Curated annotation (Swiss-Prot):
PROSITE patterns: POLO_BOX, PROTEIN_KINASE_ATP, PROTEIN_KINASE_DOM, PROTEIN_KINASE_ST. Interacts with GOLGB1. Interacts (via the POLO-box domain) with CIB1; leading to inhibit PLK3 kinase activity. Phosphorylated in an ATM-dependent manner following DNA damage. Phosphorylated as cells enter mitosis and dephosphorylated as cells exit mitosis. This is Serine/threonine-protein kinase PLK3. Its main location: other. The gene is Plk3. Constitutively expressed in post-mitotic neurons.
Length: 647
């Protein structure tokens, strides 16, 4: 589409009369989606006049849609050309905000710098015009908003995700610097995400031409948390300042907050000038090394864009070709396509657990239950009076939780575990990485303390494992939830549960396939599993006591209880991973328990030796610290999760 107007005039031109009727053509009605195809419209419609934007020179009309964002000078809306149905992001700047010459000059500068940029990772400039009320800048629409929105939903990202986004930022930034343009406001909110998850650098409101050092402007500009020390010291803004901002972006995505962020702006600026920040030990060594290289006080000491791309963080770490859309709100399952990793996974499964049968009779595409289960392994439970051995946990001697040296920090001696469990839906890797990111962010920044902060007065009801039995040498792992639902994760990876009232059986051959039966109508092929499930339920009811004094949860409040995806036993604790992201760690020696749940926000529930339970916001623990008892268990849980991570 050709620009509808030339350059901005030095002064607003007279108000143009709005057309008496919308232009001919299939313009979408006010209630239509801005991206509606012309062919599906019933014919010319008359949109609400207040939503129309008309180019005074060409007469072309646009329908203003949803608000995409707003800043100090402008608001950004989705806008659709009524003739072509092409959707744009339009930046609307009131004339009243650019009444002074220097204000108007900034807008002219932004347009002049942006209009000729053509790069895959730069937001595309389309055209602009103005009327008596506003200036309109039409840009490429990035439908998934910005990296700031993803960060707010996720708080921290995985290192492969950070590499994925940084590579695109670096590509766009390299293009800008080669054309002699400094962005000067690199931050999460200025990295926009398209429908197919590509990143585009945008918002050139503070951009400037690169000048020789002696001619650079000394003004302080940018966003406080991302401003380089030389800018604060009024030494001018060069390419190295953009690199500094990029380092702050990388740190924020990996650690959950900007490196120099404080509650006071003066203190933030002091930390920036002194380069005073903390590198969490939970980050990988290449990530820490790259951040330390970028965030250096002297611009001359910082790496160039080419040097950053050659760093081990990028060359030796996995970068996905594309991120799933779901990663905007939840941790993605990122498994590198590595033959060695696949071989290792097969060996691990052969040692620690059997996967469910994949013979053709067990096809997940068949909807008929009898066909679905016809190929299941038939398991005989023997004589009904045969009792399973006592739970393995009860036979273990108390163990110490004294921390070991860093080089021996991974939990050793896994006694037993399940396999990968379900192969579809929310995976073990997803749960592990999500918990790992959240927990390491909490532990890494936690200050020393002698006692726990105040717990939540009325936490939401929590579904947790109150009893468990490990009989995986024959059948599987049985457990009872606090809602009184009893379930078994069988050795073949299937899952069966009995409702709290013992009237309904829930069967999951995979995490995305679910069948419910009344107890009296369970198919014959599933009767062996039901017999085992009932026996587990009876054993736990008669021989085991509830593992803590958390409030009971009525099953009606939990219509879809979490499924156990995987369990792992070490010499000190039992780790359980659930399909809703809940992580529970039971410590054998003193019967304490740690439960991570919620995620938005993350909740940490600690069941102490005396069976009393308290729930804390992870953000409070991060800010205020916690007792040595809880800290040790959080660190052990972190090591357990790290040991399960494929990274």
């Amino acid at each position: 589409m050709e620009p509808a107007a030339g350059f901005l005039s030095p002064r607003p031109f007279p108000r143009a009369a709005a057309p008496s009727s919308p232009p001919a053509g299939p313009g979408p009605p006010a209630s239509a989606s801005p991206r509606s195809e012309p062919g599906v419209l019933a014919g010319p419609q008359t949109p609400d006049a207040s939503r129309l934007i008309t180019d005074p020179r060409s007469g072309r009309t646009y329908i203003k849609g949803r608000l995409l964002g707003k800043g100090g000078f402008a608001r950004c809306y989705e806008a659709t050309d009524t003739e072509t149905s092409i959707a744009y992001a339009v930046k609307v700047i009131p004339q009243s905000r650019v009444a002074k010459p220097h204000q108007r000059e900034k807008i002219i500068n932004e347009i002049e710098l942006h209009r000729d940029l053509q790069h895959r990772h730069i937001v595309r400039f389309s055209h602009h015009f103005e009327d008596a009320d506003n200036i309109y800048i039409f840009l490429e629409l990035c439908s998934r908003k910005s990296l700031a929105h993803i960060w707010k939903a996720r708080h921290t990202l995985l290192e492969p995700e950070v590499r994925y986004y940084l590579r695109q930022i670096l590509s766009g930034l390299k293009y800008l610097h080669q054309r002699g343009i400094l962005h000067r406001d690199l931050k999460l909110g200025n990295f926009f995400i398209t429908d197919n998850m590509e990143l585009k650098v945008g918002d050139f409101g503070l951009a400037a031409r690169l000048e020789p050092p002696e001619q650079r402007k000394k003004t302080i500009c940018g966003t406080p948390n991302y401003v380089a020390p030389e800018v604060l010291l009024r030494q001018g803004h060069g390419p190295e300042a953009d690199v500094w901002s990029l380092g702050c972006v990388m740190y924020t995505l990996l650690c959950g907050s900007p490196p120099f962020e404080t509650a006071d702006l003066k203190e933030t600026y002091r930390c920036i000038k002194q380069v005073h920040y903390t590198l969490p030990a939970s980050l990988s060594l290449p990530a820490r090394q790259l951040l330390a290289a970028i965030l250096r006080a002297s611009p001359r000491d910082r790496p160039s864009i080419e040097q950053i791309l050659r760093h081990d963080f990028f060359t030796k770490g996995y970068t996905p070709d594309r991120l799933p859309v779901s990663s905007c709100v939840t941790v993605p399952d990122l498994t590198p396509p590595n033959p060695a990793r696949s071989l290792f996974a097969k060996v691990t499964k052969s040692l620690f657990g059997r996967r469910k049968s994949k013979n053709k009779n067990h096809s997940e595409e068949q909807d008929n239950v009898s066909c679905l289960v016809s190929g299941l392994m038939r398991t005989s439970i023997g004589h009904p009076d045969v009792r399973p051995e006592a739970p393995a946990a009860s036979a273990l001697a108390p163990v110490s939780l004294v921390e070991t040296a860093a080089e021996d920090s991974s939990p050793r001696g896994t006694l037993a575990s399940s396999g990968d469990g379900f192969e579809e839906g929310l995976t073990v890797t997803t749960v592990v990485e999500s918990a790992l990111c959240a927990l390491r962010n909490c532990v890494a920044f936690m200050p020393p303390a002698e006692q726990n902060p105040a717990p939540l007065a009325q936490p939401e009801p929590l579904v947790w494992v109150s009893k468990w039995v490990d009989y995986s040498n024959k059948f599987g792992f049985g457990y009872q939830l606090s809602s009184r639902r009893v379930a078994v994760l069988f050795n073949d990876g299937t899952h069966m549960a009995l409702s709290a009232n013992r009237k309904t059986v829930h069967y999951n051959p995979t995490s995305t396939k679910h069948f419910s039966f009344s107890v009296g109508s369970v198919p014959r092929a599933l009767q062996p599993q039901l017999g085992i499930l009932r026996y587990f339920a009876s054993y736990m009811e008669q021989h085991l006591m509830k593992g803590g004094d958390l409030p009971s949860v009525e099953e009606v409040e939990v219509p879809a209880p979490p499924l156990l995806l995987q369990w792992v036993k070490t010499d000190q604790a039992l780790l359980m991973l659930f399909s809703d992201g809940t992580v529970q760690v039971n410590f054998y020696g003193d019967h304490t328990k740690l439960i991570l749940s919620g995620w938005e926000p993350l909740l940490v529930t600690f069941v102490a030796r005396n069976r009393s339970a308290c729930t804390y916001l992870a953000s409070h623990l991060r800010q205020l610290g916690c007792s040595p008892d809880l800290r040790q268990r959080l660190r052990y849980a972190l090591r357990l999760l790290r040991d399960r991570s494929p990274a």
